[in-house]
Amino acid sequence: MNGIPASRRASSIEYAIRDVVVPAMELEREGHDLIKLNIGDPLSYPGLPTPSHMVDAFKEALERQDNGYGPSYGIEDLREAIAKDEQTKGWDCRSDDVYVTHGVTEALQVLFAAFLEQGDTVLAPGPHYPPYMAYPQMYGAKTVEYALDSDQGWAIDTDDIRRKMNDSVKFIVIVNPNNPTGNVAKPSTIKEVLSIARDWPNCTV
């Protein structure tokens, strides 16, 4: 049976976490025993169970038949709780400012699909979580990495961001705490990145 050819767009997308899956499956077929470090899935390991209060809440929701489609923007109680949490961090956030997604991966797809055009650039920290590289490619954009200083605990190199700014940059991505380095950016560093972005009207952080 002939395979269906992938589109040029799909063929050009890089996704490091998944790129190793097919070769790994081949090695397993050959009898090799692999330790899979390509993806973080702590709940799949013994000793890290789902918290009991979450299991109980899920059971109760099923028993109430409260398991249909939710509101488009997310459950209102959840959005209000998120808004209140953000208010403790100094943001005058309201529930109308909150859009609930199934994790950061879906959030990235929504953001990039909504705002990126052909030829746009996303500045993202390097190293980074693979979707920051893969998803802009889906929409005709590209990702350029800005440096993290390993000698300073993987701190954001704001000078490198300045060097890489131009009119094509639509997003500067700040991952805080950073995945995979674990670095937590100082408030002064985030303010500096915001200051850089203000000089470029097309750019959002």
Residue ranges and their predicted role:
Residues 126, 145-151:
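Short beta->alpha connector loops at strand-helix junctions that form conserved
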Residues 93-98, 118-121, 168:
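Short acidic capping loops at alpha-helix termini that bridge into adjacent secondary structure
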Residues 137-144:
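A short helix-loop-beta submotif of the ANL/AMP-binding
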Residues 3, 10-103, 110:
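N-terminal small-domain helix-loop-helix segment of the aminotransferase-like
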Residues 35-39, 145-147, 172-177:
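Short beta-strands and strand-loop turn motifs
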Residues 150-205:
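Active-site phosphate-binding strand-loop segment of PLP-dependent enzymes
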Residues 114-136:
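Conserved PLP-anchoring active-site segment centered on the Schiff-base-forming lysine
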